Amino acid sequence: MEADIQLMRLIQEMRAEIHKLEKENQALRMKLTASSQRASGSGRESGDEREEEAPGQSPATLQGAVSTDAAPAVQEHQGNVMIVRRYSISSSVCSSAVNDPWKSGKSHPKSGILEGQRTLKSLACSPIKKQDMEEKVFATDSLTSNRTSQRASPEHVCGCRDKTKAVSFLLPMDMSSYSKNSSSLKHSPNQATNQLSIIAE
């Protein structure tokens, strides 16, 4: 019984609060309609003044006004363009691109493309640098194991690297599979350098 009485009191209190809020809401709506009517009245007066000033202007100035109104739409359309760039697999190019991001983004300084390019460059350069470090470690291991076979092979490797051209897209990698691949590269020092160039490219 006491619980029912408490629930009835809570319901009555909530109804009283609802009535208060409804009254406040109606008062605010009345104020809003009054202010919107005042704003519409002042807007009509300013619109009439503009219409009176418009016949005095020449058609050239009217065309200029139309062209300036159409310009932001063109800029918005340019802001939606996606720029795709191709980067070589060398750490020097990546470091220069990260140090000087304005070279690639001077054409669109006001758009939000620069921030996206900076993040893409930083993401692209970090796996490339890791791959270069692993290539250097593997190259030193293979140099110590078989120097005689490598004396004839660098020209062949350089020729192959000059001839082959590929477009690569660097995506976020799964670190577990990446570590497995790197460990398999490190534990196989008997591979030839031309196989290393094929894996790296």
Swiss-Prot record:
Biased composition, class Low complexity, residue ranges:
179-188
| Keyword tags | Coiled coil
Query: What is the organism field in this record?
Result: Homo sapiens
Q: Output this protein's name.
A: Coiled-coil domain-containing protein 195
Q: Which residues form a coiled coil?
A: 4-38
Top-rank taxon of the source lineage equals: Eukaryota
The annotated regions of Polar residues compositional bias extend over 189-201
**Per the record, which residues fall in region Disordered?**
28-72, 179-201
Q: Does the keyword Transmembrane helix apply?
A: no
- Gene name, per UniProt, is CCDC195
